[in-house]
């Protein structure tokens, strides 16, 4: 029996009576057949009254927990009122558009399982504030001064033009209504937007200001609602149509005359191939490396020592990655990754200078956009001019030397030595110090090939 009694008490306490129930009961069975009052909720700590703008349910509609029952407008915002339990909206006591104090009965709600036909509706008892307001019948007679009849006529005609009257009051208007105890504030002519009653309308009604002031302000505001652009003319352009092609052609000519900035920085070194010729001749007898393998090995060794393949990252991108905390990717170098390739155009030629000069050098993929490596041949001629000057000097001193005729008549062909000129072009991403180290190392490799091939 005790267990059954506790179960019934819990069931009774869980019934739908949490929405502003005026009186609570404690029974051993569920309370059915009795509806409860739904009062105006306080949506903020400082809220004293509010306006009902919309009911989302009609009388007799059932609602569930979490549904929006109505919308309440306060002096700060318009907020939705949600229900906590399931139920039925039995009756709406106050429709929308009325200024209602907090705690006043606005509707009657019933349990979701109740039958509205057999339901006993509670009587709407007036609150203490309403009773005190209705009991005081003393009215403060406003001090009305004589005004011009013209302003009164304009004020009445303006109020008649407002077809859609907004019955919700602003806090300042509600304060004046309670201060001067105006019983029927809707009879006051409203000059606000959409028929809203303003503070000036109430002050004009009680005689604090001229009755024609609200109507004159209303006309002034309505004149500013629609902007008149009839007297506005578009601004004329500062240039004519004939001058536009001239400006375009002048700009094109200026672009043509401005020289393009060279993006590459060039380094040159002169290379002698005498030792390389003799080395290749010995290697050919032993059936060892060919020209392609030897030149590729020397270029790869210079790349590895100078670390030219380490492309510097973009300063802006690296700074952005540093701000985001992302790791900065650095390219690593190794001999296997940077082994270049030599692609000759003519494999049958026996001229070493021409063979290397006309060959294409395939650099690694990460250097192809930043580095250009070329070889060009330069012919140097050496004659006997120095030796001839020495002979003239001997003749002037009277030293023992060959006769002048024998010196002049002796004719020797000038000797020619052909060297290679190494040209390296780099962009800003490549370090200049590494580029200088590369060309110097490559020059040393060509002029001392035995030292390089001993490590390969």
Curated annotation (Swiss-Prot):
It is found in: Mitochondrion matrix. The lineage of its organism: Eukaryota, Fungi, Dikarya, Ascomycota, Taphrinomycotina. PROSITE patterns: BIOTINYL_LIPOYL (PS50968), LIPOYL (PS00189), PSBD (PS51826). The modification N6-lipoyllysine is found at residue 76. This is Probable pyruvate dehydrogenase protein X component, mitochondrial. GO terms for biological process: aerobic respiration; pyruvate decarboxylation to acetyl-CoA. The keyword Transport does not apply. Its main location: mitochondrion. Residues 35-110 form the Lipoyl-binding domain. Residues 136-157 have a biased composition (Basic and acidic residues). Residues 123-161 are annotated as: Disordered. Belongs to the 2-oxoacid dehydrogenase family.
């Amino acid at each position: 029996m005790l267990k059954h009694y506790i179960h019934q008490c819990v069931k009774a306490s869980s019934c739908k009576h949490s929405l502003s129930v005026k009186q609570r009961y404690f029974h051993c069975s569920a309370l059915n057949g009795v509806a409860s009052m739904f009062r105006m909720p306080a949506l903020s700590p400082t809220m004293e009254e509010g306006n009902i703008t919309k009911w989302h349910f009609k009388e007799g509609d059932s609602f569930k927990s979490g549904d929006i029952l109505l919308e309440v407008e306060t002096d700060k915002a318009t907020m939705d009122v949600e229900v906590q339990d399931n139920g039925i909206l039995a009756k709406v006591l106050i429709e929308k558009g009325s200024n209602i104090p907090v705690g006043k009965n606005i509707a009657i709600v019933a349990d979701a399982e109740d039958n509205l036909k057999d339901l006993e509706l509670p009587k709407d008892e007036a609150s203490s504030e309403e009773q005190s307001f209705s009991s005081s019948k003393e009215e403060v007679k406003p001090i009305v001064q004589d005004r011009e009849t013209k302003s009164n006529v304009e004020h009445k005609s303006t109020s008649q033009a407002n077809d859609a009257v907004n019955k919700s009051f602003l806090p300042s208007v509600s304060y004046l209504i309670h201060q001067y105890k105006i019983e029927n504030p809707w009879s006051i002519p409203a000059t606000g937007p959409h028929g809203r009653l303003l503070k000036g309308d109430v002050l004009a009604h009680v005689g604090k200001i001229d009755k024609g002031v609200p109507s004159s302000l209303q006309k002034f505001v309505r004149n500013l609602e629609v902007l008149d652009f009839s007297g506005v003319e578009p601004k004329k352009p500062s240039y004519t149509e004939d001058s536009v092609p001239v400006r375009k052609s002048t700009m094109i000519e200026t672009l043509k005359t401005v020289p393009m900035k060279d993006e590459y920085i060039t380094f040159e070194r002169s290379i002698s191939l005498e030792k390389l010729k003799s080395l290749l001749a010995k290697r050919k007898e032993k059936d060892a490396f060919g020209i392609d393998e030897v030149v590729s090995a020397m270029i790869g060794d210079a790349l590895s020592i100078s670390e030219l393949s380490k492309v510097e990252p973009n300063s802006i991108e690296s700074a952005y990655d540093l701000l985001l905390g992302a790791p900065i990717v650095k390219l690593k170098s190794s001999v296997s990754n940077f082994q270049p390739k030599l692609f000759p155009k003519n494999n049958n030629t026996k001229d070493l200078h021409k063979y290397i000069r006309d060959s294409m050098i395939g650099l690694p993929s990460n250097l192809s956009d930043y580095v250009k490596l070329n070889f060009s041949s330069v012919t140097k001629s050496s004659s006997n001019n120095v030796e001839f000057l020495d002979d003239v000097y001997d003749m002037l001193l009277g030293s023992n030397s060959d006769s002048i005729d024998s010196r002049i008549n002796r004719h020797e062909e000038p000797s020619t030595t052909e060297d290679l000129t190494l040209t390296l072009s780099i962009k800003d991403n490549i370090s200049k110090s590494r580029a200088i180290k590369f060309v110097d190392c490559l020059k040393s490799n060509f002029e001392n090939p035995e030292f390089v091939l001993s490590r390969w």
